[in-house]
Amino acid sequence: SLRMHLETADETFMDASTHGRIKPARVWKALYLDNPRVFERKDEVETPGFSVDILMDASSSRKQMQQKIAAQAYVLSKSLTNCGIPVQIYSYCSIRGYTVMHIFKEYDDYGVEDELFHFVAAGNNRDGLALRAASHLMELSPKPKKLLFMFSDASPQDDQIAGEGAFYKDREYTDALAVKDTVNEVQRLKNHGIDVIGIFMGSAH
């Protein structure tokens, strides 16, 4: 859970102070400028030691909920960013057999969350392939620990026949086969130390 990841790493900064270890180069300030801050003190600042990625299912089954999905991702991103946690956001859908990743926000972007309101749902969804792509995008994280939120209806499906390179080649990406592929990719992420949290966004009906 997110609470488990709220472990912090202490970063040490040297700051001018009225007490601590004397800094000879600053003594003249006390003599001529009446500035008593001629000492150096270590200040420890707690900073989050992890980053968060938000992966949104943008398939057509999400059409009736696309505004709600965008709003939830917006609030989550703003809250995390305000806590100093790097956030990356992207969506995925499959169109004519190709999985498309739309990046709304990268880790070092600030104030771009409004882009989420351009979120549009269309096409199918190969969840396993999207998770594999997410693992590559998360390699850009500036933090050692990584957490992935996946907004999904937990129903991976694509009726386009897969081509070369997929274990489900020449078969439709549906039912048990699609679920197995998704589970395998989640496990692969976990094996690489990435925690995955599914946020179920079911049918609006």
Language model features: what each stretch is:
Residues 1-205:
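Acidic, glycine-rich A-domain
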